[in-house]
Amino acid sequence: MAATLLDVCAVVPAAGFGRRMQTECPKQYLSIGNKTILEHSVHALLAHPRVTRVVIAISLGDHRFAQLPLANHPQITVVDGGNERADSVLAGLQAVAKAQWVLVHDAARPCLHQDDLARLLAISENSRVGGILASPVRDTMKRGEPGKNAIAHTVERADLWHALTPQFFPRELLHDCLTRALNEGATITDEASALEYCGFHPALVEGRADNIKVTRPEDLALAEFYLTRTIHQEKA
């Protein structure tokens, strides 16, 4: 059955290895409590009633995913990921060819709040381009001298935002922009950058700064703290 605007599919690129975590286990399979980071990230998406399907792109030879309860979840589809994030996202988009709108969410971003997700999804009612969750920059920003550990100058932080996920776009538009950007050799660091490359200006939807991505070892304890606090607040 074709998806409608009321239904949203999500793509989670989970084929990375996360070398900065300094662990043999890919970071998305590290545990916080009784769930892996990947499970926390996916369950946050499925908690919203509009999200009816999640496509997870995993690396070839990944033997860990099959051991998770997610592997047997009726709303989960698994595809082979690629060498780069954009390749994995495109593989996921191919699996939801009939979807009108698609979320893309980091596999290692487990602290997504439902109110943030709801605000992001609401933009589909009046946007043809989509948007991303983002957090305004609060710290003083410095640009370094190329190749040196020295300050070149201070960067004006007004209008600077940290790009977060999920990012939310019309499926066909995202597919076309990613394909064009890759074919033309553009540097794609997130899905929004592919749309920017093609001349579009996605919306910035302010989200919570504690929607962190687990990238370094110290992030794991911080994510555990945020998740534990959220669970306690929901039970209160």
Swiss-Prot record:
The keyword Transferase applies. One of its GO terms (molecular function) is 2-C-methyl-D-erythritol 4-phosphate cytidylyltransferase activity. The record marks 20, 27 as: Transition state stabilizer. InterPro entries: IspD (IPR001228), IspD/TarI (IPR034683), IspD/TarI_cytidylyltransf_bact (IPR050088), ISPD_synthase_CS (IPR018294), Nucleotide-diphossugar_trans (IPR029044). The record marks 157, 213 as: Positions MEP for the nucleophilic attack. It comes from the Bacteria. Disulfide bonds: none annotated. GO terms for biological process: isopentenyl diphosphate biosynthetic process, methylerythritol 4-phosphate pathway. Pathway: Isoprenoid biosynthesis; isopentenyl diphosphate biosynthesis via DXP pathway; isopentenyl diphosphate from 1-deoxy-D-xylulose 5-phosphate: step 2/6. It catalyses: 2-C-methyl-D-erythritol 4-phosphate + CTP + H(+) = 4-CDP-2-C-methyl-D-erythritol + diphosphate. Its EC number is 2.7.7.60. CDD domains: CDP-ME_synthetase. Keywords: Isoprene biosynthesis, Nucleotidyltransferase, Transferase. The keyword Glycosyltransferase does not apply. Catalyzes the formation of 4-diphosphocytidyl-2-C-methyl-D-erythritol from CTP and 2-C-methyl-D-erythritol 4-phosphate (MEP). Homodimer. Belongs to the IspD/TarI cytidylyltransferase family. IspD subfamily. This is 2-C-methyl-D-erythritol 4-phosphate cytidylyltransferase.
